Design a protein with these regions (language model features):
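Hydrophobic faces of well-ordered beta-strands that scaffold small-molecule active sites
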Residues: 102-110, 157, 193-197, 227-229, ...
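Generic structural signal for well-ordered alpha-helices
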Residues: 146, 177-185, 216, 254-257, ...
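Conserved SAM/AdoMet-binding glycine-rich loop
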Residues: 154-257, 261-268, 275, 295, ...
Length: 427
């Protein structure tokens, strides 16, 4: 982005910017929990806290209690018995909150361009103009892909691209984005368009020097149905300075998401884990998401539709980061444990939890159904970002494969829409 681009605090509403500073949770300090017989007591207390929050959603957000109970849940030396206790507690809470049915969505990923002005330390997807492997799809190609997806029974198209400085119409980034949405809705009117991450929204706003509120409303009017909660990575300044110093700050991410929720657009929520972050930073991130969701509910908005744990894939990451992390693929045991921890810490605030077969592989994603997840994500039809990073899960899954994964866990399964409704019969 240009050095002359306005600061996020200048394009985001002042109220959202100030509130973001209060909603953003700092990692807790204090002594780390050692192996002790009290974990089961902490788990029971956490379940009680979650049930109380579910029954009394207007009560003050229990941040202090969440941090107090969450610290021994996150930062400890684990035994196999303790891991199993956490799994059982997460599975129990999942069943209480959303039942046993596993869901999935028939969708298609669309990546219009991998040109990007940022150079995040973990990204193998981005390219500069003229660089080998750079691509930019023509609008006609995107229309064709959307129409094909609708014809194949998809209910959703997911848009995600780099921050392409040349993606303009009449010199405007926003006009180009609006034209893209109009194209997609004309080509496939039944498809829900899920796109434009907080980073992309901020980029549009800064490049066109427009208030974020105007950008979001224009996109919504053009057909945008929901926003992916990507670019969150870990909502901690220390981590972001190490892996993505050019990206929007943690406070900016929170402020943008809050303003998107205010505009009536639901979003997903994410955590990219398994790299340089600590358990306490994971805990603070999850508490921030819960606080944001409670804020959305208080304001009468849907807020987050789901939480998606995104395990770090480093096979194609720069050598320094790969060396620091010490592995190229996710650690399944660590990610399953974090899946359960997230289910417990996100309490009643974020009901649906999705496992990522792209990053974990479908067998491990199915295993996550026993650790608190209730959703297997989408069919995708194609995928480039994680695959270019070296993910081993593949680029698409069939409905048969996703339903088979759920039934293999002896769970009922259903197709859903983006917002977890039932698809129309015509789709």
């Amino acid at each position: 982005m240009s050095a002359l681009s306005p600061s996020p605090s200048l394009v985001v509403d002042r109220e959202s910017w100030e509130l973001a500073g209060h909603l953003l949770v700092d990692p807790p300090r204090g002594e780390a929990a050692e192996i002790c017989p009290s974990l089961s007591h902490h788990l029971q207390q956490l379940l009680v806290l979650n049930r109380q929050a579910k029954d009394h959603p207007a009560d003050p957000f229990p941040l202090a209690a969440l941090l107090q109970l969450g610290l021994p849940l996150m930062d400890r030396r684990w035994t196999a018995q303790e891991r199993e206790s956490v799994r059982q507690a997460a599975d129990q809470w999942r069943q209480e909150l959303v039942g046993d049915t596993v869901s999935y969505v028939v969708n298609r990923n669309l990546n219009p361009s991998n040109h990007c002005v940022l150079r995040c330390g973990f990204c193998a997807y981005r390219r500069s103009e003229g660089e080998e492997g750079a691509f930019r799809l023509h609008r006609s190609e995107l229309r064709e892909k959307a129409a094909e997806a609708q014809a194949l029974g998809a209910t959703e198209v997911c848009l995600q691209a780099g921050l392409d400085p040349y993606a303009t119409k009449n010199g405007s980034q926003l006009d180009h984005a609006v034209a893209l949405l109009v194209d997609l809705k004309e080509a496939a009117p039944r498809l829900h368009v899920h796109g434009f991450s907080p980073q992309e929204l901020l980029f549009l706003s800064q490049q066109d020097n427009l208030p974020l509120r105007e950008v979001v409303q224009s996109l919504r009017q053009a057909g945008l149905g929901s926003v992916p909660g990507t670019a969150a990575e870990v909502l901690c300044t220390r981590v972001r300075q190490l892996i993505c110093p050019e990206k929007l700050s943690a406070r900016a991410w929170v402020a943008v998401i809050r303003q998107v929720h205010q505009a009536g657009l639901p979003t997903t929520s994410t955590l990219m884990a398994g790299h340089v972050e600590t358990p306490r930073e994971q805990l603070a991130h999850l508490c921030t998401l819960s606080a944001l969701q409670r804020q959305a509910w208080l304001e009468g908005n849907t807020g987050f539709t789901e939480f998606i744990l995104l395990p770090f894939v480093g096979a194609s990451a720069p050598a320094p980061l790969r060396a620091r992390v010490g592995r190229d693929q996710p650690d399944p045991e660590a990610m399953l444990l974090l899946t359960a921890q997230a289910r417990l810490l996100l309490g009643p605030w974020i009901r649906h939890h999705q496992s990522s077969w792209v990053k974990l592989t479908l067998p491990v994603a199915a295993e996550a159904l026993d650790w608190g997840c209730d959703d297997l994500g989408g069919t995708l039809m194609e995928e480039h970002i994680s695959t270019m990073a070296g993910a081993a899960g593949g680029t698409h899954q069939s409905v048969v494969a996703l339903e088979g994964a759920a039934r293999g866990k002896h769970r009922p399964v259903r197709q859903r829409t983006t917002l977890y409704g039932a698809p129309a019969a015509s789709c």
